[in-house]
A protein has these predicted regions:
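Short, well-formed alpha-helical segments that are part of the catalytic scaffolds
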Residues: 19-38
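A conserved acidic beta->alpha catalytic loop
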Residues: 29, 50-58, 99
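Short beta-strand/loop segment that forms part of the nucleotide-sugar
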Residues: 38-52, 69
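Acidic donor-binding/catalytic loop of UDP-sugar-dependent glycosyltransferases
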Residues: 56, 95-111, 183
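Glycine-rich, basic loop-to-helix element that forms the pyrophosphate-binding segment
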Residues: 71-87
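Short aromatic/hydrophobic "clamp" motif used to bind/position activated sugar donors
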Residues: 92
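Conserved donor NDP-sugar-binding/catalytic core segment of glycosyltransferases
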Residues: 103-133
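A short, conserved alpha-helix in the catalytic core of glycosyltransferases
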Residues: 162-167, 173-193
């Protein structure tokens, strides 16, 4: 049965740390895609959480019309949570600042919200540049994501009430916070007899910059440390260089 969705507001939260190279393009994509929400009679807002940037990220975000909030501790979980804390919408959409959602993707999100059967979800991803090993790894992730279902942090949509009931993203984790949140949302969805949906008809285009900024050896070393550390690596910011060393 379709949910009563008249008068909804969608809050789009964009965590950003030193994203001056991509933030304008990302926000323009979000703004263009958000017209879908207006067409179904919903309001929307765009919130950028400046995660202690040292470049022009906050200024560029404000110039694009986003509401900008500040989180002083460099951690993706804290940045998303800080943005969600000021969000006024009944639904939250988290989009990374190096990702570029399409109107077709937002239309799918709107349809899931209107269905009343979905508590939240994510989408498969597609790199904006083709690198063979990275493309293959992305395919593996997309298959795993749909099977589990696990949401990639680059794009997560969620009922705001459910997000707050779960306490948001874990502040213990510097990476893999999206998988942790996915597991907890899956548990809640079963209690509510709703679904966590991984969309796949219109994948999220996301930047392949990490593939070029960090060597294959560096990526493999991180995966090995993560495996041997049994997850402890995810709680150590210094070990998560590809997310926190500021290379852009």
């Amino acid at each position: 049965m379709a949910a009563m969705t008249m008068g909804l507001k969608i809050s789009i939260v964009v965590p950003a740390f030193n994203e001056e190279k991509l933030i304008e393009r990302s926000l323009q994509s979000i703004r263009d895609a958000s017209s879908i929400f207006s067409r179904v009679g919903w309001e929307h807002e765009i919130i950028v959480c400046d995660n202690n940037s040292t470049d022009r990220t906050p200024e560029l975000a404000r110039a694009k019309g986003a509401c900008v909030v500040f989180e002083p501790i460099n951690q993706i979980s804290r940045a998303r949570n800080a943005g969600a804390a000021v969000a006024q919408g009944q639904w939250l959409v988290f989009v990374d600042a190096d990702s570029f959602p399409s109107a077709e993707l937002f239309a799918e999100v709107a349809a899931q919200i209107q269905s009343g059967q979905c508590i939240g979800g994510g989408v498969t991803v597609e790199l904006d540049q083709s690198v063979r090993w990275a493309t293959e790894l992305t395919r593996v992730w997309n298959s795993l994501s749909r099977w589990r279902p696990w949401m990639a942090g680059s794009f997560i949509f969620c009922e705001a009430r459910a997000f707050r009931e779960l306490g948001g993203f874990s502040r213990e984790l510097f990476v893999a916070e999206d998988i942790d949140f996915s597991k907890r949302l899956n548990q809640l969805s079963k209690m509510r007899r709703q679904q966590v949906i991984i969309l796949h008809s219109h994948p999220l285009k996301t930047s392949a910059r990490k593939i070029h900024l960090y060597s294959l050896r560096e990526h493999l070393q991180f995966l090995l440390r993560s495996f041997l550390g049994l997850g402890k690596t995810f709680k150590n910011r210094k070990a998560c260089t590809a997310w926190y060393d500021g290379r852009r």
